[in-house]
Amino acid sequence: MKTLLGTKLGMTQLLAEDGKAVPVTLIQAGPVTVTQVKTVETDGYNAVQIAYGEGKNLSKAVAGHTKSAKVTPKFLREVRVDQPVEAKIGDSFDVSVFAVGDTVDATGVSKGKGFAGTIKRHNFKASNQSHGGQGKVRRVGSIGSMYPQKVWKGKKMAGRMGAEQVTVKNLEVAYVDPETNLIGVKGAVPGPRKGLIVLGGKA
């Protein structure tokens, strides 16, 4: 199973063999522990539930659910798989499941930007600031026509921006260190520092 949970540490650079600086995102990934294995026969689908981190003040439901795996997780995630996985409750996986050159998908929650206007949120164009401009530089403008007399659902307007789940696909693994559980992927990964990242590899 090539899926890990990790914590985003930030970005840095690695020097390639040709001397070019390669931007990479460092992630403290794993180890993760299997807390439940689901199969088509018992649950109707194939999946693996994995735990990551050390949690505090767990609810009785979570504590009882993870007791057999002997973990007190901070994060618990379920990963669907096509075929049944040969893993047992209590098994652990670390960054050694990945190698330099592998391709992974990174899923995280993007940084929240708060309430944002249409120019920042939807890349609207600002109005003229001179040449007869009326001072309504950053306003939305018309939000509909005379008929039908309504605003269509999904109309791009101001509102809360960010804090949404984002997946960046096909990132190349540039660095792996099993001793410190560090993995570096080329490019940017969604979310703030210390944010949870789900790394999914191509099996």
What does each model-identified segment do?
Residues 1-203:
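Extended basic (Lys/Arg/His-rich) segments that typically form rRNA-contacting surfaces
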